[in-house]
């Protein structure tokens, strides 16, 4: 059973554990969440039956041209790669829904997308660490309602 802190967030380390967690908690839908370049949350929801171990490696396709400032229509295919360490049950949805925060990658090369805020943050942390400027970074996440 995944560890559950008091604030209802779950730390899950493997895709198998996520799938087991979904079965144990009768999850019906999976909300794949990501941010646009300015930090606005976006998401796509899929039935839990579409979530497999392969999803965590292969990702779920979406149209990047629908996001402000991302891709042209002729280069719009992108992939959402769910990150298991950020899953939690949605406390507000009546339908049992698991939320997964995703990284965004190129569907051909599987390289991180340069405008993904999570990738930008990872690059910043790596730079701070490699230059000795800092050994930790803290980010404030604002959710637009």
Language-model region placement:
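ATP/Mg2+-dependent ligation/transfer catalytic cores
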Residues: 2-142
């Amino acid at each position: 059973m995944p560890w559950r802190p008091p604030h209802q967030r779950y730390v899950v380390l493997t895709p198998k554990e996520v799938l087991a967690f979904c079965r144990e908690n009768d999850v019906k839908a999976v909300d794949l969440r990501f941010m646009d370049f300015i930090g606005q949350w976006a998401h796509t929801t899929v039935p839990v039956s579409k979530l497999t171990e392969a999803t965590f490696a292969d990702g779920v396709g979406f149209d990047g041209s629908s996001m402000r400032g991302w891709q042209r229509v002729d280069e719009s295919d992108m992939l959402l790669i769910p990150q298991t360490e950020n899953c939690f049950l949605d406390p507000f949805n009546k339908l049992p829904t698991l939320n997964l925060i995703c990284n965004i990658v190129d569907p051909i090369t599987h390289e991180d997308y340069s405008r993904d805020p999570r990738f930008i943050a990872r690059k910043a942390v790596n730079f701070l660490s490699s230059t000795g400027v800092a050994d930790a970074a803290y980010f404030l996440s604002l959710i637009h309602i």
